UniProtKB/Swiss-Prot annotation:
Gene3D superfamilies: Nucleic acid-binding proteins. Belongs to the CcmE/CycJ family. It comes from Polynucleobacter necessarius subsp. necessarius (strain STIR1). It is a single-pass type II membrane protein. GO terms for cellular component: plasma membrane. Residues 1-7 are cytoplasmic. The gene is ccmE. Heme chaperone required for the biogenesis of c-type cytochromes. Transiently binds heme delivered by CcmC and transfers the heme to apo-cytochromes in a process facilitated by CcmF and CcmH. Residues 29-144 are periplasmic. NCBIfam families: PRK13254.1-1 (NF009727), PRK13254.1-3 (NF009729), PRK13254.1-5 (NF009731). This is Cytochrome c-type biogenesis protein CcmE. Heme binds at H121, Y125.
Length: 144
């Protein structure tokens, strides 16, 4: 085999390897993406079907119920409420009336099955998407 052919073969093999690596990286990134939606968007059917996503808002006052390690509560954007079930230990800062972001999937009964619960970490902090959604919900609620 001539050196020219060897060089071409090496270049082709390198391009194939780079292409395979890029596909694997994109596949891994795509499977780990968790879109953020609000309770109003979930109620409107805009939530991703069959894939994990994040839902954020406020934990509704009086909705927190514990049954062993299973916790049931309602997440709200002050316009729509979504029931949530979580099995595990909640973060220390998780409280009723406070902001939270929950990752998981919707089940067939319309309940959000959480795999991860994140509580806001500062008295004044709220994810920008959640703050915007709450502001919009309050604005729409006061316009009625």
């Amino acid at each position: 085999m001539k050196p020219r052919h060897k060089r071409a073969l090496i270049i082709i093999a390198a391009l194939i390897a780079i292409g395979v690596a890029a596909l694997l990286i994109l596949n891994a990134l795509n499977s780990n993406i968790a879109l953020y939606v609000t309770p109003s968007e979930v109620a409107a059917g805009k939530a991703p079907q069959g894939q994990a996503f994040r839902i954020g808002g406020m934990v509704k006052d009086g909705s927190l119920k514990r049954d062993g390690l299973t916790v049931h509560f309602v997440i709200t954007d002050l316009a729509k409420d979504i029931p949530v079930a979580y099995i595990g230990i909640l973060p220390d800062l998780f409280k009723e009336g406070k902001g939270a972001v929950i990752q998981g999937r919707m089940n067939a009964n319309g309940e959000f099955i959480a795999s991860e619960v994140l509580a806001k970490h500062d008295e004044n902090y709220m994810p920008p998407e959640a703050k915007h959604a709450l502001d919009q919900a309050q604005k729409n609620g006061s316009a009625k």
